[in-house]
Amino acid sequence: MSYYREPTYLISFMFRRILVPIDGSASSLKALDIALDFAKRYGSKLTALVVNDKTINVEEVSGEVSSRARKSGIEVVLKIKDVRNPNESVVSKVLEEISEGSYDLVILGARGRTLSEDLLIGSTALSIIINSPVSCLVVR
């Protein structure tokens, strides 16, 4: 196996627009950090999506996203979507944004804020991965 010091330009062409769903959990913030690194190395455009399902503090999560983006020197578009009725879910809002935004990659945390540490992947992440029309990178 050989190691290349030159950047791989294939990644910069494949993953130009990246979506990062954020719920404030440790794994979603880790996903944001990885996405920021992608943007720094490959020039990707980042969008952070916070879905307000009334269980998270949107202002706190938005502030954390802005703080990390500012520290890294990368511009991040922050979108907030609300779950307005019982027929909508976090998953449906994320998938809706993927379709509307023409993203190339979704980087998401494996587990949300409420799941047991015994689980390797949460139901929301799994549903997004299964139904996403684009590539997904799952961060543990």
Regions found by a protein language model. Give the residues of each.
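Gly/Ser-rich helix-loop-strand patches that form or flank binding pockets
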Residues: 1-4, 98-140
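Structural beta-alpha unit
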Residues: 3-9, 72-106, 114-115
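Small/aliphatic-rich secondary-structure junction motif
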Residues: 8-77
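Structural motif
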Residues: 10, 37, 97-98, 129
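Generic recognition of short, well-ordered alpha-helical segments
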Residues: 30-33, 59-61, 89-92, 119-123
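A structural preference for short, hydrophobic beta-strand core positions in alpha/beta folds
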Residues: 48, 78-82, 138
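Alpha-helical structural signal in soluble globular domains
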Residues: 64-68, 72, 97, 127, ...
